[in-house]
């Protein structure tokens, strides 16, 4: 996972056989492609696909957005590692002495974002905004890398996905383990904060390992048991449990 600070976010994806975006942008244009003559493939029948206009306004669903955000807040409050409206400086103080990979979720101080993911890295605490659009949450990125970033129905699902990915890479016994999922770069959380460009060579490996639980949000024994059950069972409905207990498990179907 590479995290780079700068005025424009840069998403670096390191995969076998795949080149980073900046390398693709430096390629010289090749020879122009000549169109095939008509009837070159008589057995193929092409169908015209209607092209949707980019200027066509998207259909908004305020009720769906409200339900999605309310569900996310409910999950975060149950998690114990949602710190609410603390600032970036306060998050830095909490994570400064924690081991690498410790993270928390807090409210973003930027008016265009709801949440921010604060993570302890090898270079210190780093902040990554979480953007919301079309009833989905994803890590903040620029326009070019946005199609590569996965979207999730809530923030806890997003965090759990990257924690599982980093854990799988850590446990890999292969001599050349696959690169961890690329997370977008850190940005200043408040508008107007100074941005110092950092070259790609000084990129920071950003990994998510364990959440930093608030002391004031000490998780109950019931919740801890629920986490263990969620880690061991994929489908709660298959368990012979009373309805009340099954409903409690469904209220927080996560492992963190």
Swiss-Prot record:
<keyword id="KW-0833">Ubl conjugation pathway</keyword>
<dbReference type="GO" id="GO:0001960">
    <property type="term" value="P:negative regulation of cytokine-mediated signaling pathway"/>
</dbReference>
<comment type="subunit">
    <text>Stably associated with the tyrosine-phosphorylated IL3 receptor beta chain and tyrosine-phosphorylated EPO receptor (EPOR).</text>
</comment>
<dbReference type="InterPro" id="IPR035887">
    <property type="entry name" value="CIS_SH2"/>
</dbReference>
<dbReference type="GO" id="GO:0016567">
    <property type="term" value="P:protein ubiquitination"/>
</dbReference>
<dbReference type="InterPro" id="IPR036860">
    <property type="entry name" value="SH2_dom_sf"/>
</dbReference>
<keyword id="KW-0734">Signal transduction inhibitor</keyword>
<dbReference type="GO" id="GO:0005886">
    <property type="term" value="C:plasma membrane"/>
</dbReference>
<feature type="domain" description="SH2">
    <location>
        <begin position="81"/>
        <end position="162"/>
    </location>
</feature>
<comment type="function">
    <text>SOCS family proteins form part of a classical negative feedback system that regulates cytokine signal transduction. CIS is involved in the negative regulation of cytokines that signal through the JAK-STAT5 pathway such as erythropoietin, prolactin and interleukin 3 (IL3) receptor. Inhibits STAT5 trans-activation by suppressing its tyrosine phosphorylation. May be a substrate recognition component of a SCF-like ECS (Elongin BC-CUL2/5-SOCS-box protein) E3 ubiquitin-protein ligase complex which mediates the ubiquitination and subsequent proteasomal degradation of target proteins.</text>
</comment>
<dbReference type="GO" id="GO:0046426">
    <property type="term" value="P:negative regulation of receptor signaling pathway via JAK-STAT"/>
</dbReference>
<dbReference type="InterPro" id="IPR036036">
    <property type="entry name" value="SOCS_box-like_dom_sf"/>
</dbReference>
<comment type="pathway">
    <text>Protein modification; protein ubiquitination.</text>
</comment>
<dbReference type="Pfam" id="PF00017">
    <property type="entry name" value="SH2"/>
</dbReference>
<keyword id="KW-0341">Growth regulation</keyword>
<feature type="region of interest" description="Disordered">
    <location>
        <begin position="168"/>
        <end position="190"/>
    </location>
</feature>
<dbReference type="GO" id="GO:0035556">
    <property type="term" value="P:intracellular signal transduction"/>
</dbReference>
<keyword id="KW-0727">SH2 domain</keyword>
<dbReference type="GO" id="GO:0005126">
    <property type="term" value="F:cytokine receptor binding"/>
</dbReference>
<dbReference type="GO" id="GO:0019221">
    <property type="term" value="P:cytokine-mediated signaling pathway"/>
</dbReference>
<dbReference type="InterPro" id="IPR000980">
    <property type="entry name" value="SH2"/>
</dbReference>
<feature type="domain" description="SOCS box">
    <location>
        <begin position="207"/>
        <end position="255"/>
    </location>
</feature>
<dbReference type="InterPro" id="IPR001496">
    <property type="entry name" value="SOCS_box"/>
</dbReference>
<dbReference type="Pfam" id="PF07525">
    <property type="entry name" value="SOCS_box"/>
</dbReference>
<protein>
    <recommendedName>
        <fullName>Cytokine-inducible SH2-containing protein</fullName>
    </recommendedName>
</protein>
């Amino acid at each position: 996972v590479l995290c780079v600070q700068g005025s424009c976010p840069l998403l670096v994806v390191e995969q076998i056989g795949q080149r980073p975006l900046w390398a693709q942008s430096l390629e010289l244009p090749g020879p122009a492609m000549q169109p095939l003559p008509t009837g070159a493939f008589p057995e193929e029948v092409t169908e015209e696909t209607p092209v949707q206009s980019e200027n066509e306004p998207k259909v908004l669903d305020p009720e769906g957005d409200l339900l999605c955000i309310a569900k996310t807040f409910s999950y975060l409050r149950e998690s114990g590692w949602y710190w609410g409206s603390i600032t970036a400086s306060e998050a830095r103080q909490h994570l400064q002495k924690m081991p690498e990979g410790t993270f928390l979720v807090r409210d973003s101080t930027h008016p265009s974002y709801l949440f921010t993911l604060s993570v302890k890295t090898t270079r210190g605490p780093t902040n990554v905004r979480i953007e919301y659009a079309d009833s989905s949450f994803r890590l903040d990125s620029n326009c070019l890398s946005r199609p590569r970033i996965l979207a999730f129905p809530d923030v806890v699902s997003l965090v759990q996905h990257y924690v599982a990915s980093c854990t799988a890479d850590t446990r890999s016994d292969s001599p050349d383990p696959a690169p961890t999922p690329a997370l977008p770069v850190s940005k200043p959380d408040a508008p107007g904060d100074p941005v110092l460009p950092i070259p790609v060579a000084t990129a920071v490996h950003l990994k998510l390992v364990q959440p930093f639980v608030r002391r004031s949000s000490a998780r109950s024994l019931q919740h801890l048991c629920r986490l263990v059950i969620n880690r061991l069972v994929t489908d709660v409905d298959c368990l012979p449990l009373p309805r009340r207990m099954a409903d409690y498990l469904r209220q927080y179907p996560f492992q963190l």
